[in-house]
């Protein structure tokens, strides 16, 4: 599972950290009510020292992941929600900055990957195309789960 973020301002963000929490509803039996559950997701990288262009935050879905057995139908039934919290230090204003976002089960794009959003410009400097931040393409069949 992947999320992509970018800094649309010219000021530097350092010591950027990401935390991703999974939330789902577990139905009770006849005597207990449904309960919302939470689990922190392990990330390939939780922190970057400098946030120059973009960052693709990755949670590997393997046997240790709470999402390992989830498919689209399970996500809907359990009313899955993914909470993303980003925190970093804005060098220009010497402030801690926060950003959070929530994704519900119906916003998940299955069997897709992000398209590249940066390329070399005419002077050789890297150009970041922010309009492509959410743009995805279908995975080839051999890479689909």
What does each model-identified segment do?
Residues 24-27, 41-53, 103-117:
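Short, surface-exposed linear segments at secondary-structure transitions and domain or protein termini
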Residues 35-76, 88-95:
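Extended, solvent-exposed segments with strong compositional bias
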Residues 83-85:
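Intrinsically disordered, low-complexity polar regions and short flexible loop motifs
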Residues 1-34:
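Canonical alpha-helical transmembrane segment with a positive-inside/aromatic-interface signature
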Residues 21-23, 31, 59, 100-104:
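Generic alpha-helical propensity signal that fires on short helical segments
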């Amino acid at each position: 599972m992947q999320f992509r973020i970018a800094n649309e301002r010219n000021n530097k963000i350092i010591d950027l950290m990401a935390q991703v929490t999974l939330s789902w509803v577990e139905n009770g039996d006849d005597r207990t009510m449904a309960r919302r559950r939470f689990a922190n997701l392990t990330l390939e990288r939780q922190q970057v020292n400098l946030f120059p262009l973009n960052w693709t935050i990755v949670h590997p879905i393997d046997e240790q992941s709470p999402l390992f057995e989830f498919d689209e139908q399970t996500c809907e039934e359990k009313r899955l929600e993914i909470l993303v919290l980003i925190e970093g230090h804005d060098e220009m204003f010497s402030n801690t900055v926060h950003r959070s976002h929530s994704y519900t089960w119906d916003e998940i794009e299955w069997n897709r990957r992000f398209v590249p959003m940066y390329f070399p410009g005419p002077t050789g400097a890297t150009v970041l195309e922010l309009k492509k931040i959410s743009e995805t393409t279908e995975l080839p069949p051999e890479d689909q789960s």
